[in-house]
From Swiss-Prot:
The gene is MPG. Binds MBD1. Binds SSBP1. GO terms for biological process: base-excision repair; depurination; DNA alkylation repair. It is found in: Cytoplasm; Mitochondrion matrix, Mitochondrion nucleoid; Nucleus. Belongs to the DNA glycosylase MPG family. Residues 9-25 have a biased composition (Basic residues). InterPro entries: Formyl_transferase-like_C_sf (IPR011034), MPG (IPR003180), MPG_sf (IPR036995). This is DNA-3-methyladenine glycosylase. The keyword Cytoplasm applies. Residues 1-65 are annotated as: Disordered. Hydrolysis of the deoxyribose N-glycosidic bond to excise 3-methyladenine, and 7-methylguanine from the damaged DNA polymer formed by alkylation lesions. The keyword ATP-binding does not apply. Binding to SSBP1 in mitochondria inhibits glycosylase activity in the context of a single-stranded DNA (ssDNA), but not a double-stranded DNA (dsDNA) substrates.
Length: 298
């Protein structure tokens, strides 16, 4: 029979043996000792208000966060470590290569209460400036409304359509050239996005939006991220409320479809040019072009 005194000594002997080369095996009839493992806590076309969510703790919101959200895409590999904020050198390229380069990057929006929303870009459109009959800057036309298109690369150009919806563009290299963001794959803050979308929807506000409906269109993504006219002419490389992070992996060339832009039928031959780019097979894309997909594969 083992006395209580001996029972009390067993843990001390075990603790002293920890860190030595090898533990002595238990004698026959005596159970092996074990330690508890600590577990981590569970955790449209080129042609607004912030969510009332309980604020999360804010330390110092001076720069972009360095950790991605919990959502993992099946169309891109998972992040390996921290994501990097993209600066002027990324945006300073012509509209077409920039529109392609946007695919796979992560757009981040920090709300006033500290909540951060993230979405991976899966669809864009390039607008080439004065020569492009579908661009707001066609013919070199510059107005207070489209001034962001003529500012340095990385400047936001946000305009309103139908008197109530917003579209978000980013200026590129070349006067009057820019890239329209058409669709995102939601990554982080989906419930806040859903709340923002529902607040601004008409008629069907009672229907719960599916994840793939949150950001599948230029105005939808602006609603989901609370992007409005106040963001016009902001610098995406410097702003503290909205920025771009480098995605873990850009889609390979065969995965990128080049198709005609949407809603620019008035632009003659420019309406048919393949200046819209999207990730093949992504359910978050706003408009799928099967003919263009076949041409891309050929």
């Amino acid at each position: 029979m083992v006395t209580p005194a001996l029972q009390m000594k067993k843990p001390k002997q075990f603790c002293r043996r920890m860190g030595q080369k090898k533990q002595r095996p238990a004698r026959a009839g005596q159970p092996h000792s074990s330690s508890d493992a600590a577990q981590a806590p569970a955790e449209q076309p080129h042609s607004s208000s912030d969510a009332a969510q309980a604020p999360c703790p804010r330390e110092r919101c001076l720069g972009p966060p360095t950790t991605p959200g919990p959502y993992r895409s099946i169309y891109f590999s998972s992040p390996k470590g921290h994501l990097t904020r993209l600066g002027l050198e990324f945006f300073d390229q012509p509209a077409v290569p920039l529109a392609r380069a946007f695919l796979g990057q992560v757009l981040v929006r920090r709300l006033p209460n500290g909540t951060e929303l993230r979405g991976r870009i899966v669809e864009t459109e390039a607008y080439l400036g004065p020569e492009d009959e579908a661009a707001h800057s066609r013919g070199g036309r510059q107005t207070p409304r489209n001034r962001g298109m003529f500012m340095k690369p990385g400047t936001l150009y946000v305009y309103i359509i139908y008197g109530m919806y917003f579209c978000m563009n980013i200026s590129s290299q070349g006067d009057g050239a820019c890239v329209l963001l058409r669709a995102l794959e939601p990554l982080e803050g989906l419930e806040t996005m859903r709340q923002l979308r529902s607040t601004l929807r008409k008629g069907t506000a009672s229907r719960v939006l599916k994840d793939r409906e949150l950001c599948s269109g230029p105005s939808k993504l602006c609603q989901a991220l609370a992007i409005n006219k106040s963001f016009d002419q902001r610098d995406l490389a410097q702003d503290e409320a909205v920025w771009l992070e480098r995605g873990p992996l850009e889609p390979s060339e065969p995965a990128v479809v080049a198709a005609a832009r949407v809603g620019v039928g008035h632009a003659g031959e420019w309406a048919r040019k393949p200046l819209r780019f999207y990730v093949r097979g992504s359910p978050w894309v706003s408009v799928v072009d099967r003919v263009a997909e076949q041409d891309t594969q050929a």
